Amino acid sequence: MDEKKIVYDVVLSVWNLAKEHGFEKLTDEQWDSLVEKATIERDKFKQHGENIDLLFRQMYMALQNYYERK
């Protein structure tokens, strides 16, 4: 698969996590859902190597930080 497409998929995946969980402070159930779904998404990207895995993890951490600051 083309690396540009994989990077696009990472960005889209993190965006979809944010869109699905809303833009307000998360409840405990929503937080658990976010973590569970992010773990599934990360497993999809691990196979594409360390750089792609790191990109996903860092973007996901930024999303977590966004929610923690709400």
Regions found by a protein language model. Name each.
Residues 28-36, 54-57:
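Short, charged, amphipathic alpha-helical segments
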Residues 18-25, 45-48, 70:
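Secondary-structure edge/capping motif, primarily at the C-terminal ends of alpha-helices
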Residues 7-10, 14-17, 34-37, 41, ...:
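Amphipathic alpha-helices that form helix-helix packing interfaces
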Residues 43-69:
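Short, charged early-sequence alpha-helical segments and their helix-coil boundaries
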Residues 1-28:
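N-terminal acidic leader/helix
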